[in-house]
Structures are given as C-alpha cells and as structure tokens.
Swiss-Prot record:
CDD domains: LipB. One of its GO terms (biological process) is protein modification process. Keywords: Acyltransferase, Cytoplasm, Transferase. GO terms for molecular function: lipoyl(octanoyl) transferase activity. The active site is at C171. The record marks K137 as: Lowers pKa of active site Cys. In the reaction, the free carboxyl group of octanoic acid is attached via an amide linkage to the epsilon-amino group of a specific lysine residue of lipoyl domains of lipoate-dependent enzymes. It is found in: Cytoplasm. It holds the Pfam family LplA-B_cat. The gene is lipB. This is Octanoyltransferase. Its EC number is 2.3.1.181. The keyword Transferase applies.
Length: 218
C-alpha cells in the first residue's frame, strides 16, 4: 500500500479524441521521475477502435467508418465511444510497491466494488482481464508499464451505442457479449460512473487524498 499521505490527482478531461490523450499519456510517463505525482485521467472518447500489441487483424471484422488505431497497450482490439467511461491510471507502481498483476487486480476490484454499490454482481476472470456481469463483459482493461509506471487503463460501458462491438471480436473473443451499466440500473451517466469509480479506485489503491483538475494542464 502507498504511504498514507499519498495524493491521487484526478484529471477530468471531458470528451477528447483518443490519439491526443494517448500521446499525452506517453509524454507524461516518459518525462516523469520519482517525484512525479500519480494521476487518474477520466475521459470519454469519440468512436474509435484501438488494437493492442497482442491484437490480430482478423479480430477486426468490419470497422466501417470508425478509425482503427494501433497502440502500445497490452491486449487485443476494443471499442471506445460516447457513453463509455475511460479511466487512465498513471501511477508509479515501483513507488506503490505493487506489481502489474496486483495493479490489474486492484483496478478490477475497484470496478466490482463500484458496481456493487448499485446491487450489480460483477466479477473478474482469471484468464480474461476485465469485469463481467452474467458472462457479459462490462469493462475492459489494457495496460502498459514503462519505467515502472503505468499508463492506458480501463473502459466501462455506461450508456452507449453497443453496435460497434459487433464489428470486432472484443478483446479477441469471437461472439463475446457486452453489457453496460444503465440497463442494469447501475450508474446512468459517464459523470456519475466516474464519481463513483474515483471513490472505489482511490480506496482500493490506498490513496488518502484527492486533488481534482480540469483538462491536461493545471
């Protein structure tokens, strides 16, 4: 667990295109040192498919007019779009004294505990990172660790057009069904989901203080 006085800085980015946020994550990670602060970026993206480092082109079935971007995270192809909460933890896991597997577990548990606030029984799977409800995937994970620091993160389906998921094999699984929060009487908006996830994420990682920022610059 981190020190009790560890602060987590929350950046509320609103809706921003994927590539600009991705490159900002890379830049922050490349330039950080042992004094750099841990941040959690909360964002919503316009429609985009992102293909992880393990991704295979055959899992992109029919992208149509939605762009496909090859990125430097783990995992296979996924979809981001309006109505989906995306959260990027930019953490010094060396300083936190946790490994990547523990970080994945902590992220999954923060989602599970957030959904439990609404009476939704969600769970992770050992062989397929992410969070599931009744065998349907409600949240996807894909991380990258560089210099002992994390970037990329999670995507939670809240209230979105789910049809683009039918154009891919989500996370490389043909026929994988997806779920979202609103029909399950979970959080009804990305904003509501973000507020609750910030709470459970900071508790799961042991952060005692939160500081909020708007946009990518202070």
């Amino acid at each position: 667990m981190p020190l009790k006085d560890t602060v987590l800085h929350i950046r509320h980015l609103g809706r921003q295109d994927y590539e600009s946020v991705w490159h900002a994550m890379q830049e922050y990670t490349d330039n950080r040192d042992e004094t750099s602060r841990d941040e959690l970026w909360i964002v919503e993206h316009p429609p985009v498919f992102t293909q992880g480092q393990a991704g295979k082109s055959e899992h992109i079935l029919n992208p149509g007019d939605i762009p496909v971007i090859q990125v430097d995270r783990g995992g296979q192809v996924t979809y981001h779009g309006p109505g989906q909460l995306v959260a990027y933890p930019l953490l010094d896991i060396k300083r936190l004294k946790i490994g990547v597997r523990q970080l994945v577990t902590d992220i999954e548990q923060s989602i599970v505990k957030m959904l439990a606030l609404y009476g939704i029984e969600a769970y992770p799977k050992a062989d397929a990172p992410g969070v599931y409800v009744e065998e349907r995937k409600i949240a996807s994970l894909g991380l990258r660790i560089r210099k002992g620091c994390s970037f990329h993160g999670l995507a939670l389906n809240v209230d979105m057009d789910m049809s683009p998921f039918q154009r891919i094999n989500p996370c490389g699984y043909a026929g994988l069904e997806m779920a979202q929060c609103k029909p399950l009487k979970g959080p009804q908006s990305v904003e509501e989901a973000g507020e609750k996830l910030i709470q459970t994420f900071s508790q799961e990682l042991g952060y005692q203080h939160l500081e909020h920022h708007q946009g990518l610059t202070d």
